[in-house]
Amino acid sequence: MMVLKVCLLLVFLAGVTTARMDLNHLIGSNHHDSSDEPSESSEPCCDICVCTASIPPICQCTDVRLNSCHSACKSCMCTRSMPGKCRCLDTTDYCYKSCKSSGEDDD
C-alpha cells in the first residue's frame, strides 16, 4: 500500500512539473513591460507575428503582455501570477503593426 502511495505521489509531481514547464514557455522573455494604463494595453500591435504560407495566411501574435491583451483580442489567456502574463490566442489573416515602432519615439 505504501508503494502505491509513493507511486501516485511521483506521478502527481511529474504532472505538476510538466505543467509548470509549459507555463514557463508562455511567460518567457518575449513580453512587453507594460503598465496597467488602458491606452497601452488596448492598442492592437504585435512584435512577434507568425503566419502560415497559405492563401489567405493564418497569422497569430505570440507577444506576451502584462495583465491584459489588446482591445481587439477576443480570446486572451493569462497566467495567474502577479503580474499576469497574457497572450492573445486569436488568429487573423494579417499582422498588427509593430509595438516597438510606436514606443521608440519616446527616447
UniProtKB/Swiss-Prot annotation:
Signal peptide start and end residues: 1-19
The keyword Nuclease appears for this protein: no
Residues of the site described as Reactive bond for trypsin: 80-81
PANTHER family: BOWMAN-BIRK TYPE BRAN TRYPSIN INHIBITOR, BOWMAN-BIRK TYPE PROTEINASE INHIBITOR C-II
Keywords: Disulfide bond, Protease inhibitor, Serine protease inhibitor, Signal
Protein function: This protein inhibits elastase and trypsin simultaneously and independently.
Gene Ontology MF term list: serine-type endopeptidase inhibitor activity
Regions annotated as coiled coil: none
Residue pairs linked by disulfide bridges in the UniProt entry: 45-99, 46-61, 49-95, 51-59, 69-76, 73-88, 78-86
InterPro entries named in the record: Bowman-Birk_prot_inh, Prot_inh_BBI
Keyword Transmembrane appears in the UniProt entry: no
One GO CC annotation: extracellular region
Membrane-traversing stretches: none
Protein name: Bowman-Birk type proteinase inhibitor 2
CDD domains hit by this protein: BBI (cd00023)
Post-translational modification (record): The N-terminus of Bowman-Birk type proteinase inhibitor 2 long is blocked.
Note: Two forms of the inhibitor were isolated. The shorter form is probably derived by proteolytic degradation.
Gene behind this protein: BBI
Alphabetized PROSITE patterns for the sequence: BOWMAN_BIRK
